[in-house]
Each structure stands twice: as structure tokens, then as C-alpha cells.
Regions:
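A structural signal for well-ordered alpha-helices, especially hydrophobic packing surfaces
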Residues: 27, 34, 50-57, 80-87
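N-terminal acidic leader/helix
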Residues: 5-37
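Short intrinsically disordered terminal tails
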Residues: 1-10, 85-89
């Protein structure tokens, strides 16, 4: 049986790439925090954002652009914005 090709979307790929860079930047800033307790607190709070980003990226890599893609991106962006509001970094 032929494997179904996943649908690609260049604009969505740019959004995923931008999201990746944002996650990497925040992680780098968290790793630069000297106080271990504060670093753990920030990391714990940011784990949800990383989890949502990983889910978004994996869904796109496996299934391509689909009905759920925009919802996953919105969930990631909401979590990222909430983190930025609650934690100064």
C-alpha cells in the first residue's frame, strides 16, 4: 500500500522555525541563571512550552500540515506568552 504524502506548508514551516528559535533563546537564558533554585523554577515553568513545541514539531513532521496544526501552534503561542508574562527573562 502506498504511503500517504504529508501536506507541506512553507508559511507554517517558518512559524515552526521561529518557534524553535524562541524556545532555544529562552532555554539559553534559563541556563545562564546562576541561582540554581531560580533556574529550576524557570525550567519547571518552561517545560510546558517545550512540550507543546515538541508536539507541534512532531505532528508536522509526521502528518504534515493538517486540521490540527493551527490549534497546536495557538496552544504553543499561548503557553509561550503566558510564560513571558509570568517570568521576566
Amino acid at each position: 500500500m502506498a504511503k500517504k504524502r504529508r501536506k507541506l506548508n512553507k508559511d507554517f514551516e517558518k512559524k515552526i522555525y521561529s518557534s524553535k528559535k524562541n524556545v532555544e533563546l529562552v532555554l539559553a537564558k534559563i541556563y545562564d541563571i546562576d541561582d540554581e533554585d531560580i533556574q529550576k523554577e524557570y525550567m519547571s515553568a518552561f517545560n510546558k512550552v517545550v512540550f507543546l513545541y515538541d508536539g507541534l514539531k512532531e505532528d508536522y513532521e509526521v502528518k504534515g500540515y493538517n486540521d490540527n496544526s493551527e490549534k497546536l501552534l495557538t496552544n504553543y503561542k499561548s503557553a509561550f506568552n503566558l510564560f513571558e508574562e509570568e517570568f521576566e527573562i
